[in-house]
Amino acid sequence: MAYYRTPSDVTALPAWQALNKHRQAMQNFSMREAFNTDPQRFSQFTLSSAGLFLDYSKNLITTETRDLLVSLAGEVGLKDAIKAQYDGELVNSSEGRPALHTALRRPVGDKLKVNGVDVMPDVHRVLNQMTELVGRIHDGLWRGYTEKPITDVVNIGIGGSFLGPELVSEALVAYAHKGVRCHYLANIDGSEFHELSMKIRAETTLFIVSSKSFNTLETLKNAQAARAWYLAQGGSEVELHRHFIAVSSNNAAAVAFGIREENIFPMWDWVGGRYSLWSAIGLPIALAIGMSNFKELLSGAYTMDQHFQSAPFEQNMPVLLGLLGVWYGNFWNAQSHAILPYDHYLRNITKHLQQLDMESNGKSVRQDGTPTSTDTGPVIWGGVGANGQHAYHQLLHQGTQMIPADFIVPIVSFNPVADHHQWLYANCLSQSQALMMGKTRAEAEAELREKGMDEQEVQKLAPHKVIPGNRPSNTLVVERISPRRLGALVAMYEHKVFVQSVIWGTNAFDQWGVELGKEMGKAVYQRLTGGTEEQADDASTQGLINYFRGRHRG
């Protein structure tokens, strides 16, 4: 029986029971001692694939831990689940859909049927449509209402229509096509639109309205604001089609807005928003870095797809990272996971991974509707590593919670300045080393005595200088952030999330919690604006509505 129809109670499986016992045996495990006694530890717990090098040796694991986690993956049927996803089975059971974002990066000639129809010709037709548009804009052939070429592209979208494309276009700025600047408009806060409008000219700006339904509130409101601004700047309704295109499955609504049908790029219901940067949602990426680099991005992701499908679990990067997350979340009570990129251009990867992980695995029922028997997705947080060292790394080192971390660092900088990059790389390694090693009481005391401090002061200050250590982390190293390697990196995290959903028996491809807030937002808006005098369902919400109505001006 398919895993998504009858998910296992993972806590009843033999491997889970064995992991419980193993966890007790690991209570006093010391990574410091493990490295001191096993010269092969680094080589045993490292691997490379698709241009990524993973060091997971700084984890609270032994080879037995890895074997037990791999056994757990086998017992929940992970191999069959991976095949089910790639074959287009209805792994998104609550919506009755497949989850086939991986199809978007498959090469020409592959075949994949959904409801009996091969979808691959459509996938490559849209890629060709994107290639044509990008070429026309980059060659200066797509012109605005004053016949000037396009210089600015504004992507209007939110969630997956924004976070992934923004991450990639900023991470690959070294590959940017000169002459076209890309901007993102997501928030419904008018200040964001105001600031953007100060940077662009209507006559040379192309807006991409990215919304599957063409009815997403924030996106539609921003599109309407952009349309009104364009008209106020001298644009006309007749020439609107030169300045607005859409990525949507609702052609009728896009056409009614003023977008020509040939400038509407399709979306499929088998691609979820947070997995959609590989589709026409990635148009701003292609416009930023060129279509050949966009295809390199797809190629890197496809290489990771192949690794995920074929590598044995004990040598499978996404599988191991997913299993380590289960190990810490379910057996060590870790509640969050830090993503720490040591690269300025990767500064937005944490935001993308927050949505990818938390929207996918923030679930409390299994695929069959029964409650989960374990904790599920952690809080994902973090930020640029060097900056974080002077902010929240303190909590990682001396806080009371265990917070596993992923360090991500390139070997080569696109913009070398003196020895800055050597220091950046050194800081990345030293942070993971410090988390693992810590500082003992004896070491703290010896350090203070060396400074000539009297014994009373030593004993007073030493407890504050103790760093527990034994804090787990992974280090992901790439030679440099290229389209191909970035594609592999993002795809790796997609697969990691899927692995964990299979272990927990949850659906990684729906997001009903998001829908509830949207529906309630409409009702609150009606009460705020006087559309209804009906009271809110609770006194707090009604009180805040009244507070707003009594003070709002404008």
Swiss-Prot record:
Pfam families: PGI
GO biological process per UniProt: gluconeogenesis; glucose 6-phosphate metabolic process; glycolytic process
Localisation per UniProt entry: Cytoplasm
Enzyme class (EC, first level): isomerase
InterPro entries: G6P_Isomerase (IPR001672), G6P_Isomerase_C (IPR023096), Phosphoglucose_isomerase_CS (IPR018189), SIS_dom_sf (IPR046348), SIS_PGI_1 (IPR035476), SIS_PGI_2 (IPR035482)
Pathway given in the UniProt record: Carbohydrate biosynthesis; gluconeogenesis; Carbohydrate degradation; glycolysis; D-glyceraldehyde 3-phosphate and glycerone phosphate from D-glucose: step 2/4
GO cellular-component term (any): cytosol
Cysteines joined through disulfide linkages: none
Active-site annotation: 359 (proton donor), 390, 518
MF-aspect GO terms: carbohydrate derivative binding; glucose-6-phosphate isomerase activity; monosaccharide binding
EC number(s) recorded for this UniProt protein: 5.3.1.9
CDD domains assigned to the protein according to its UniProt record, in alphabetical order: SIS_PGI_1, SIS_PGI_2
Keywords: Cytoplasm, Gluconeogenesis, Glycolysis, Isomerase
Primary localization class, coarse: cytoplasm
Reactions listed under catalytic activity: alpha-D-glucose 6-phosphate = beta-D-fructose 6-phosphate
Family the UniProt entry places it in: Belongs to the GPI family.
UniProt function note: Catalyzes the reversible isomerization of glucose-6-phosphate to fructose-6-phosphate.
HAMAP family, sorted: G6P_isomerase
The protein's name: Glucose-6-phosphate isomerase
Organism: Pseudomonas syringae pv. syringae (strain B728a)
Lineage of origin: Bacteria, Pseudomonadati, Pseudomonadota, Gammaproteobacteria, Pseudomonadales
